[in-house]
């Protein structure tokens, strides 16, 4: 029986682990016999071994500098080698301090060898996966302990009984995530995330010239508790990295959710457009704009107020106004009142809009900012009442009004009452604009849809939209199902609507504060000392 081994070139005196991959290789054309058992041995770099987990093709180089491609498909159980040269037959190996991944042919786990294309299929992957799991787990465990040794000493003996017991008492550096990796090997999400994170850690250590990545957020992400994943959504990241020796390799990671880990979310924000990572601590100072592609991500109402209003001039109105389930809406999943309470705790708001008085570059204004994080910014009776009171207050004080829209439309849990808010706000706006001749600026952010678009969102004297904002009355899916027609992509983005005359201007966030200020000055509003009236707080 001939053997084909995966040589990781890992020179570790303390770690020796063997797991053999055996297959009759009589017809494997270009690959010569270099191993001790007469079978060919393929040389892999450590990082390339980690990449075996991904269903992707990656480039490898042997010690002679010759390169070839390897494809490993877990789902279809295919391992394929595509050499760029005829140099695979001359590979030589060192027999000590190396890790092998071998799987015996006892259970016919490997069959249907294709000599022409140099690939074989795995029919029974149970042995293959279990032994690959064991080797990979041992490598990661050893690496974590080795990197921590630069800070403090640790017991060098790490027996299988210690690992299987799951006890933390025997070793203060016990890594529960690494332990759990063995038992969640069939979970593709955990596998991809763990490997992707570890590779990123290795990249950081290479680029910094250091041999430890304990300071890296990725390292703490791998070797820590409390890791959770979700199956919603997907994304892909491809990175090309060059090492100090000049060799390069490709890493392709998969993220199955923008919020797949709480720790990662606290440190990084992933762009919805290009999937680039933005450092969270600097993200607010960048106004939630992606540094890589310039995409405008969603902002909370509090961040909007901080961006738009001069510091120390914000005076909120009607903060205690809350909904009391006016139509007693009942849902099989979750009662409406419970949902309201849940969103109030999550967003820190009483409802989907904040209204108040402030100054914009010294000019007193009345401003309302909707928050999409609160039930999708849906417009219920509280939202309608707060905006109506804001406009009426602006009429009494002759203030310009700015409303920042971010809404999914009317709130279905309040039925006809939510629809009546459209008429109520529009009536107040008519009195403000037509009778009092005051100035109203509407700012549309992504998304602005439904009843908000059909009412006060489009009633501004000046209508400003953010770049790439999703502005529509009905969503794309609703239109397609209603009309039974395919809607072209990009039909409901701000740029398309702007060319059709729906908006007056598209303004990025950086100069957004200055544009309304110039408009107010043009219409006769100037800086002045302003003392806001004490607002009436109504609880319903």
Swiss-Prot record:
Cofactor names: Zn(2+)
Primary location class: plastid
Catalytic activity: N(6)-carboxybiotinyl-L-lysyl-[protein] + acetyl-CoA = N(6)-biotinyl-L-lysyl-[protein] + malonyl-CoA
Top EC class for this record: transferase
One GO biological process term: malonyl-CoA biosynthetic process
Binding-site list for Zn(2+): 271, 274, 290, 293
Pathway: Lipid metabolism; malonyl-CoA biosynthesis; malonyl-CoA from acetyl-CoA: step 1/1
PROSITE patterns per UniProt: COA_CT_NTER
Location of region: Disordered: 229-249
Domain CoA carboxyltransferase N-terminal as annotated: residue spans: 267-538
Subcellular location: Plastid, Chloroplast stroma
Protein function: Component of the acetyl coenzyme A carboxylase (ACC) complex. Biotin carboxylase (BC) catalyzes the carboxylation of biotin on its carrier protein (BCCP) and then the CO(2) group is transferred by the transcarboxylase to acetyl-CoA to form malonyl-CoA.
Family: Belongs to the AccD/PCCB family.
Descriptive protein name: Acetyl-coenzyme A carboxylase carboxyl transferase subunit beta, chloroplastic
Species for this entry: Amborella trichopoda
Gene of this entry: accD
